[in-house]
From Swiss-Prot:
Keywords: Cell membrane, Disulfide bond, Glycoprotein, Ion channel, Ion transport, Ligand-gated ion channel, Membrane, Receptor, Signal, Synapse, Transmembrane, Transmembrane helix, Transport. It is found in: Synaptic cell membrane. The keyword Ribosomal protein does not apply. It comes from the Eukaryota. Disulfide bonds join C158-C172. One of its GO terms (biological process) is membrane depolarization. GO terms for cellular component: acetylcholine-gated channel complex; dopaminergic synapse; neuron projection; plasma membrane; postsynaptic membrane; presynaptic membrane; synapse. Activated by a myriad of ligands such as acetylcholine, cytisine and nicotine. CHRNA6 nAChR activity is inhibited by the antagonists alpha-conotoxin MII and PIA, a small disulfide-constrained peptides from cone snails. The gene is CHRNA6. It comes from Gallus gallus (Chicken). This is Neuronal acetylcholine receptor subunit alpha-6. The chain crosses the membrane at residues 241-265, 272-290, 306-327, 469-489. The keyword Membrane applies. Residues 1-31 form the signal peptide.
Amino acid sequence: MHPKRRLCWCLPASGAWAFMLTSLIADTTACESEERLFHKLFSRYNQFIRPVENVSDPVTVHFELAITQLTNVDEVNQIMETNLWLRHIWNDYKLRRDPREYDGIEFVRVPADKIWKPDIVLYNNAVGDFQVEGKTKALLRYDGMITWTPPAIFKSSCPMDITFFPFDHQNCSLKFGSWTYDKAKIDLLIIGSKVDMNEFWENSEWEIVDASGYKHDIKYNCCEEIYTDITYSFYIRRLPMFYTINLIIPCLFISFLTVLVFYLPSDCGEKVTLCISVLLSLTVFLLVITETIPSTSLVIPLVGEYLLFTMIFVTLSIVITVFVLNIHYRTPTTHTMPKWVKTVFLSLLPKVLLMQRPLEQEKKNISKKTKKGSAKTSGKSKHSKHKDNKLHKEQRCCHCDKADDLTSTRRSRLSHQSLKWMAEHTEYSPEVKDVINNVQFIAENMKSQNETKEVEDDWKYVAMVIDRVFLWVFIILCVFGTAGLFIQPLIADT
């Protein structure tokens, strides 16, 4: 190989080896510097002693809360589970150094169990450890400033009011403070007035409306010292879409099905069947959604009140339907209609409810036609009476020879004289008398049947009026009862 080409190939290779060797030496130097730094910082360090130069001075701890997830809200056990990051910032004078002595190293990550930490705990913790585990590392700056941000999952106790479930709001708090150090030893300062929600994952059931923090100085009965705590209040609102679609709307439909019971005619025989079917469907529905409703005896939730209202609604409709059917099938042989029933249910309420019987309308039309025709026939009344008398005399003389004429002419006189009077005061053959008696029996029987049918129709009409009354009553109760129940959360918010 040519010497010049060999030299050109060797120069880049030697440069790469030189760069790698320099980097290795630099890394080795940095590792040695960091090792010297750790040895210098922790060789005589005691993590159990408060990092203050003067014993009377407090350690100022800056505290901030960041929430990443609202995991669960247990209404029955009154527990709120959250995933949090707790940021602690304080200064430890014993860990200060000059970065120039250690190759410019300004930040080091140190195990949290090797340094002193403020014993900040969650006062209202319900399940698990009250204190944060020190398995994460802390960031140590050259001037002794320590930033420690451990993650934690807390299950905090939260008194809950589910009166307006599922349109309820809850106010849950997290109270942090030192468990053993009073304000003279540790002074907590809050960073900002709000919870950091930059890394928050939205919850499918709850929405955080507001999350504010406050500092409190409290003197407890057990001790004379004043203790400092920082309390974060989470004002959360339940998203009611799931319960509205799967709980409230089906109950609303069941309520309106109950209203339709009173629109169903009594003659169809399906009124009680429809009522029982609605009641059974509501019962099955309640068994399905029992686990969805918070099981508590402290208060009755709003949706529980609505379900109870619907159950009473359906049960009452069954009772009223049985009563209406009892009235519908009454007859003159079993019941006598009182006068007040006729006045109220046959005259007064139908006018109020804008109901009108077809027979009454026909009677009105006939009476109008009669009044119009009475004026035309008044002038011919005397002539007709004279003609009837003459015809009567002729029939008495020749009643045997003109039997056919007797039948045709007496049709007009049946409305003026009874058949009984005719049979007693007129001499007829036995055959004619039998015919008259039979006709009289048939007429009386038909009259009795017509009277019975009129009374039965009156009872049926009374039942129809009662149905119409309760139809409007149940519509009003259903609309205003439903609106009144679900307007309560809006009124409570205002």
